[in-house]
Amino acid sequence: MTRRGSRTLKVDFTAGQLTHFGGIYLLHRFLQQLRFRTLLSQSIRLTEYHHRYSISERLLALVYPMILGLENVELTRLLGTNGVFQYLTGLPQFPRPNTLRRFLIGNAPTLLPQSRHVHNRLRRHFLTLGFSTSSYWLDFDSTVKTLYGHQEGVVKGYNPKNKGKKSYHPLICTEGHLGDCLGGELRDGNAHTASGVKEMFIKILTFLPPVRSLRIRADAGFYDSGFIEEIQKNKASFAVVAHLTRPLKDRLVGLRYKKINKVQSTAEFDYQPHGWRDAYRFVILREKLTEKRKEQLKLFTIEAHAYHVLVTNLSLTPFGVFTFYQDRAGMERIVRILRDDYPFGTAPTQSFMANALYAELSLLAYNIILWFQRLCLPPDWQSYTVETLRHRLLLIPGVFTRTDNRPLLKLPKNSLYQDIFLYADKKIHALNSLGF
């Protein structure tokens, strides 16, 4: 007997009170429990008259789509027709994309510094919440976001994957243990990698909780005397990849190397680079190359050896310094997440300041998800990516009904993650408000 699908099924677009975003209830409850909207309302001031949406409503209307993975402002239209989402998040009639763009363009110079100030207060709060440490590790990096159009600041610059293409060149700082983004700044596409890093470091110090030690890691783009002097001035430790200038290269061959294993050996020396005020400790990791390894590396080589060089003030052994630096791989993963899973570094408007505000809000969206994950989800969910969290918890279908005149959100009874949902809801209920 031949089996066929139904030939008589009818389709009717009449169902109401449905949503793709049933799981956003958890994020809404998380922010509600913290009294996040109250914090925005009390901390961010803007002179306006008779606007349909409050400042906090428009800021959240920008942040929520970022959390859900909607890639640009235009896609917020999807939420404008979703009454259940609007009810769950307390956003009556979601603002239109043009409304949000005008909000960014018209108010960015006023809102950006205030938003950063609020974000920094939140960063300090969540660094100390549920986590105890005697040391923070700050990782600095930059990324490139290729863009098309004529937006302010989108110019040709360092863009190794798309050479000759225009881009922004944002700067980022994260904490090495937790992954929190402690700073981010949109920059012109032709900005030097180290441009603004000293100022960002100084700003982070103003809200970083006191600890016994502070360590900084950065790649060769941040091999900058001003940055390193500022680190020294603040009694912090650092490991920064050195530029292999000719004087440095000339020193590598004549050193006495200590063998670590069959392929690696280390050495060190003190050296004052040209134009620097002081001499610093330089540590070298020499690696014996196979033919396969030669193809993988883009490092300075001499006689079948590759040389990795760090400038540091750490008291660790040379190999210990490299072990510490190599733990920085987590930063590269975070950069990819910000670039690929959030709209960090994109250009929703032609205005640089408006796009910088949008970038700051995307970092806030990233941190909100991270804080929610750390405080409200089980230990075995701590390593999950934002894409997995969206798929398993946030983007689950729901039906909104009323029972005994009380609102009820119905989620699928066969959900694989019902226990996780209830676990998170219980954890949220136990949280204290921000109390700023």
Question: Model-found features: residue ranges?
Answer:
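Dynamic "connector" segments at or just before major functional cores
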Residues: 1-165, 169-209, 234, 396-436
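Catalytic cores of alpha/beta
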Residues: 225-229
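Generic beta-strand/beta-sheet core signal
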Residues: 79, 141, 184, 217-219, ...
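Short, glycine/acidic-rich hinge or "gate" loops at secondary-structure transitions
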Residues: 77, 93-94, 214, 376-386
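Short, solvent-exposed helix-loop connector elements
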Residues: 42-50, 318-325, 341-357, 373-384, ...
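Acidic/histidine-rich, metal-coordinating catalytic segments
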Residues: 213-223
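Short amphipathic alpha-helical "interface-anchor" segments enriched in bulky aromatics
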Residues: 30, 76, 144, 318-361, ...
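An anionic, glycine-rich sequence signature occurring as long contiguous blocks
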Residues: 2-9, 13, 237-340, 398, ...
